[in-house]
């Protein structure tokens, strides 16, 4: 394992497998002989160094948005579309989806395989950790600051709900919302699926939740839906009397939790679901590791 970073991090240590490993300068690193290279340092770093690593023979798994929407680069959730991994050799780069997309795809794919999904309406309740470590530190300070909220302090995470994640685009939707649209279509392999998203930041440290309504081509009864989800990989299904919560199930867990499943009262072909997952683990780090494991096990 070679932990890479900028010169600012030289001399620091990271812990792996009960060992301390010193950080290495990314600019001077030789990627020859490296099997896998994981990029999580932002799109600019991935843009500059991922091709260098890929050209040296490393399989690059990129956790940024830099390569997600390029046609010749696979965008992978292993439980959903691992068969697409065979195309990674086009450029030796694989894209890891956005955190909110990953848990959505894990939950919806079993239904989509049985009866194709025509439309998805989603409202996300995304934790502050999705904005980075400094955002969590700001939330913690705001929660104990007696002078909060100060008028000049932004963002106002504590005791607040913020209906904007990412820059607002020309169509009025935020970048986070459009990521859900673009990535869902690519992962499920259908441009015909209609996706309507609202992404919201909530004062939770870790764990994204999503309220989702889907319309399928056929009328599916609840027993069938629950049976499909209960047999699907990486899903823990909750019964009618209980439901997943971010504070209990969205932190330190590897599964995607699904509950509050019910038929839409206004449309017989529509279903409502509540989906919770750890955005740092399944929403990022774990999914990228699963991609590497799938390549190793499948001998692509």
Which role fits each region the language model picked out?
Residues 37, 128-300:
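Charged docking surfaces used in two-component/phosphorelay signaling
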Residues 1-157, 192-194, 246, 256-257, ...:
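N-terminal Rossmann-like NAD(P) cofactor-binding subdomain of oxidoreductases
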């Amino acid at each position: 394992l070679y932990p890479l970073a900028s010169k600012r991090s030289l001399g620091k240590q990271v812990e792996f497998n009960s060992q301390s490993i010193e950080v290495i300068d990314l600019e001077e690193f030789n990627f020859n002989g490296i099997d896998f290279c994981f990029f999580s340092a932002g799109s600019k770093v991935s843009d500059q160094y991922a091709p260098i690593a890929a050209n040296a023979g490393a399989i690059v798994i990129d956790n940024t948005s830099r390569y997600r929407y390029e046609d010749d680069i696979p965008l992978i959730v292993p439980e959903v579309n691992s068969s697409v991994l065979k195309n990674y050799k086009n450029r030796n780069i694989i894209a890891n989806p956005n955190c909110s997309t990953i848990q959505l795809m894990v939950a919806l794919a079993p239904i989509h395989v049985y009866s194709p999904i025509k439309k998805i309406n989603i409202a996300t309740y995304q934790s502050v950790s999705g904005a980075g470590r400094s955002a969590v530190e700001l939330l913690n300070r705001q929660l104990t600051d007696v002078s909060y909220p100060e008028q000049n302090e932004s963002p106002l995470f504590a005791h607040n709900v913020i209906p904007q994640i990412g820059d607002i685009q020309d169509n009025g939707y935020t970048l986070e919302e459009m990521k859900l649209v673009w990535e869902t279509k690519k992962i499920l392999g259908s441009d015909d699926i209609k996706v309507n998203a609202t992404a919201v930041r909530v004062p939770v440290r870790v764990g994204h939740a999503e309220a989702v309504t889907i319309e399928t081509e056929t009328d599916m009864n609840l027993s069938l839906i629950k049976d499909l989800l209960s047999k699907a990989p990486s899903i823990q299904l909750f019964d009618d009397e209980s439901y997943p919560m971010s504070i209990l199930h969205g932190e330190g867990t590897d599964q995607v939790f699904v509950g509050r499943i019910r038929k839409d009262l206004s449309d017989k072909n529509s279903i409502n679901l509540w989906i919770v997952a750890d955005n740092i683990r399944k929403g990022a780090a774990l999914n990228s590791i699963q991609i590497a494991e799938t390549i190793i096990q499948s001998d692509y």
